[in-house]
């Protein structure tokens, strides 16, 4: 085994670090493939969701900054995954009577969301429901705010699903879609390969706007962050 000393060139240290990074990336790819990002399953799915709780933090917080939060609101997070977005929303709502509901059609995702938010579920501030965006098990006009973060890519029928979202949103309520990639010139080869590999629905800003309008949303606003591939789209019921 070769030991690295403080006298070795800095370039050698950087090479070693890059090698470790490459191994980590390969491991993450394996976990993602086995875990199935479209519908997380098994232990690899749980590992992937916990990683996504961290990796989605920046884009989520950037997008949530555009929203106003009411401490008495009832919010829904569609495709709640590992549950971190639910917690971020409740934190921004602050003390009060507000409730955040998470929905996901993956059993593993629901388990992870419940695990992460067990204290808030016990307190009555959260609940998690296993269901699909295509058939949300809620009455019309149930929510003041609805979000979906890094989930829209996998919706089988985007237009009908958005209409279902609008159905359960209260009049004048807000819906926000958040994604860390949108269709544009200059996307990296790795991003393009992932879009193809995982069969992701990735739209241009104008296509998102048109889709929201077709689903019946008004006051549609599209935000993109310069220097990134991030996008968030807001619509009002």
Residue ranges of predicted features:
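N-terminal auxiliary segments of SAM/dcSAM-dependent transferases
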Residues: 2-30
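C-terminal alpha-helical "lid/dimerization" subdomain adjacent to the S-adenosyl-L-methionine
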Residues: 25-53, 174-234
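Conserved alpha-helix/loop element of class I SAM-dependent methyltransferases that forms part
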Residues: 54-73, 88
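Short glycine-dipeptide loop
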Residues: 72, 96, 169-175
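Class I SAM-dependent methyltransferase SAM/SAH-binding core
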Residues: 74-135
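A short acidic, Gly/Pro-enriched loop at the edge of an enzyme's catalytic core
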Residues: 134-145
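A short SAM/SAH-binding and catalytic strip from SAM-dependent methyltransferases
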Residues: 145-157
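A short glycine-rich, Lys/Arg-flanked "PGG" loop and its adjoining helix->strand segment in the class I
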Residues: 159-171
């Amino acid at each position: 085994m070769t030991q690295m000393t403080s006298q070795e060139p800095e370039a050698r240290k950087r090479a070693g670090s890059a090698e470790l990074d490459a191994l980590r990336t390969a491991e993450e790819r394996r976990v993602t493939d086995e875990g199935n990002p479209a519908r997380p399953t098994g232990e690899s799915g749980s590992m992937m969701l916990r990683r996504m709780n961290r990796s989605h933090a920046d884009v989520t917080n950037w997008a949530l900054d555009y929203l106003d939060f009411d401490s008495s609101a009832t919010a829904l997070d569609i495709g709640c995954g590992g549950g971190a977005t639910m917690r971020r929303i409740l934190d921004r709502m602050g003390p009060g009577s507000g409730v955040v509901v998470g929905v996901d059609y993956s059993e593993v995702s629901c388990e992870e969301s419940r695990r992460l938010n067990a204290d808030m579920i016990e307190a009555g501030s959260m609940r998690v429901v296993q269901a699909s965006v295509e058939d949300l098990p809620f009455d019309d006009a149930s929510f003041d705010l609805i979000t979906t973060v890094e989930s829209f890519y996998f919706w089988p029928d985007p237009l009908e699903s958005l209409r279902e979202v609008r159905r359960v949103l209260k009049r004048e309520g807000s819906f926000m879609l958040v994604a860390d990639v949108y269709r544009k010139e200059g996307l990296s080869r790795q991003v393009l390969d992932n879009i193809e590999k995982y069969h992701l629905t990735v739209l241009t800003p104008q296509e998102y706007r048109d889709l929201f309008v077709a689903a019946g949303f008004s006051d549609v606003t599209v935000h993109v962050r310069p220097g990134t591939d991030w996008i968030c789209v807001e619509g009002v019921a």
